[in-house]
A protein has these predicted regions:
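Blade-level signature of beta-propeller repeat domains, shared across WD40, Kelch, NHL, RCC1
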Residues: 355-378
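Beta-strand-rich domains and repeat architectures in extracellular enzymes and scaffolds
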Residues: 83-107
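Per-blade loop-tip surfaces of WD-repeat and WD-like beta-propellers in eukaryotic adaptors/scaffolds
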Residues: 68-78, 113-135, 139-143, 153-177, ...
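Loop/turn segments within WD40 beta-propeller blades
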Residues: 93-99, 136-142, 148, 179-185, ...
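Intrinsically disordered terminal extensions that flank WD40 beta-propeller domains
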Residues: 1-83
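Loop/turn-rich, solvent-exposed surfaces of beta-rich toroidal or solenoidal domains
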Residues: 303-332
Length: 378
């Protein structure tokens, strides 16, 4: 169900509150044979003339699987892992900074916590929002998880216990986006359909500053030193707000439609943006950069009439970028050549978020088909 702005209104009724037992983790292991289902003295060898790409031989005595095919590049149980359990569209997903777990959420208002390795079990469900969850972020050390919701609040969760430790209230409409500061006091910035960007200190009650924007704000992030907030929205501009002067210091122009995702590179020099004009751009946000800050434009991914907030992300080393796309594909580009490295199929709905694992060659995607995929890349 979408509101007039193209984003979901809050789901109503108990149908959107599945119990823990209703949530079933479904995992598809690509082309694998389970030796446990065979007699103990049997060895299994493909007998078809046309053999599969990956030939799997089950050695019964050692109870191990040996894969004959392309070399593995990650510690995932299989090259592709599928996780099901959400009752509605998945809008957001993030790896924990330690890489061992991940969180996902969306229209069903539930935050599901998953193991990355092994069987990828859904080991916890966090409840508390009364509206769709639009964005999730862990803080730098992974101790807290932040969630922005259409219930006009931002949840602050203890990622170890799953307890909600704070509820940030002050916005008067949907909160589309949130982002915690990388360093210093635990600040978080938020953006809303009420046309404001707010700055919060989780130790204090209420926002510590509000920046007034003219139009709805769809994406926010901090700069690397956490003394500036960058915001994008339906006015097609990226605005940079200075927290020491409490004012707008410059605006970056170039996109021809709403900006739905922002992501800062790990070293803090470049900003990535995803827009409904069907381009992804890299901007130089270093001090004293040239006035024309847009340094690269990437094409391939698509937005459509659904107007979902499609996000974007950097790999940890900055060599790759990824973006969500309404055409059901995961797009990954090389940042140097601007070439599409991967256009990954699998989802049956708009891919709303794609993120890179903090340590391994793994990408995670969440989509409107209610599913999450993890896959290893080269």
């Amino acid at each position: 169900m979408l509101n007039s702005g193209g984003r979901p209104s809050s789901p109503e009724g108990s149908a959107f509150e599945p119990t823990r037992s209703d949530i079933v983790t479904q995992i598809k292991l690509a082309s694998m044979i389970d030796p446990k289902k065979r007699a103990a003295d049997m060895a299994i060898v493909p007998t078809a003339v046309k053999r599969p790409r990956n030939e799997l031989v089950a050695a019964a005595q050692s109870q191990q699987l040996m894969a004959m095919g392309p070399p593995r590049t990650s510690s995932l149980q299989a090259p592709i892992m599928l996780m099901s359990g959400h009752e509605g569209e998945v809008y957001c997903c993030k790896f924990h900074p330690n890489g061992a777990t991940l969180a996902s959420s969306g229209f069903d208002r539930l935050i599901l916590m998953w193991n990355v390795y092994g069987d990828c079990e859904n080991y916890a469900t966090l409840k508390g929002h009364s509206g769709a969850v639009m964005e999730l972020h862990y803080n730098t050390d992974g101790s807290m998880l932040f969630s922005a919701s259409t219930d006009k609040t931002v949840g602050v969760w203890d990622s170890e216990t799953g307890e909600r430790i704070k509820r940030l209230k002050g916005h008067t409409s949907f909160v589309n986006t949130c982002y915690p500061a990388r360093r210093g006091p635990q600040l978080v910035c938020t953006g809303s359909d009420d046309g404001t960007v707010k700055l919060w200190d989780v130790r204090k009650k209420g926002a510590i500053h509000t920046f007034q924007n003219t139009y709805q704000v769809l994406a926010v992030t901090f700069n690397d030193t956490s003394d500036q907030i960058m915001s994008g929205g339906i006015d097609n501009e990226i605005k940079v707000w200075d927290l020491r002067q409490n004012k707008l210091i410059y605006t970056m122009h170039g996109h021809g439609d709403s900006i739905t995702g922002l992501s800062l590179s790990s070293e803090g020099s470049y900003l990535l943006s995803n827009s409904m004009d069907n381009t992804v751009r890299i901007w130089d946000v270093r001090p004293f950069a040239p006035k024309e800050r847009c340094v690269k434009i990437f094409q391939g991914n698509l937005h459509n009439f659904e107007k979902n907030l499609l996000r974007c992300s950097w790999s940890n080393d900055g060599s790759k970028i990824a973006a969500g796309s309404a055409d059901r594909f995961v797009y990954i580009w090389d940042t140097t050549s601007r070439r599409i490295l991967y256009k990954l199929p699998g989802h049956a709905g708009s891919v709303n978020e794609v993120v890179f694992h903090p340590e391994e060659s793994i990408v995670l995607s969440g989509a409107s088909d209610k599913r999450l995929y993890m896959g290893e890349i080269q």
